[in-house]
Amino acid sequence: MGTVLQIKNLTKRFGGLTAVNDVSFEIERGSLIGLIGPNGAGKTTLFNLIAGSEKPTNGSIWFDGVNITKYRTHKRVNYGIARTFQVVKPLRFLTCLDNVIVGCMSPRGKARSENVGIEQYASTILASVGLIDKARIPPIILPFGDLKKLEIAKALAPNPELLLLDEPFSGLSHEEQTIIVNLIKQLNEEGYTIIIAEHILRELMALVPRVLVMHQGKLIADGPPKEIVNIKLVIEAYLGVGN
């Protein structure tokens, strides 16, 4: 299906701290990828670099064959990259529908909604995440599980090709995690390329066919979950076992 994302020797330093250290990998179009590592491993910084909210110290980012390293966030959204955040921050006093409509105003969102209208397109997105019955209420009264769904709906609004999901299972009950797992499966089946940064391994390892492992800013492993969990370096880095 072709490569959609290429990360080449990507490095990000904050003063004397190297948060991402010479990371390289490629993502095929339509892939479903897990990104794991202990706290401080560099997962969120890597997402920030891909999404454009941080600038790399060295290296490059290629999307659909275009070098987007110097592109600002809004231009990357227009190219087809969208993300969620660990801490959900909806526009609290707009309705859930209006939160999604804001994202639909991007060029890709407008193009996708041209035949049906932006409000109908936004409603379709809310329905796809199971929130159509909450369309007219403000997110400040939503339970946390629904806020996580709204976060995904907002990311879908600009009609992305690549979705970066930052800890979508965090803070959820097992039942709520299962709902999000099924939603992610559905989105991947619809053709979205998805990278999930997560520390809840039980759900993630059963969901994705490929896992990237980061530790101290470095990419230390890349492969199927069954292989990853048996690599000594991964066990030591993630579980704190060994010397």
Segments predicted by a language model, with ranges:
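Glycine-rich phosphate-binding loops of nucleotide-dependent enzymes
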Residues: G2-N243
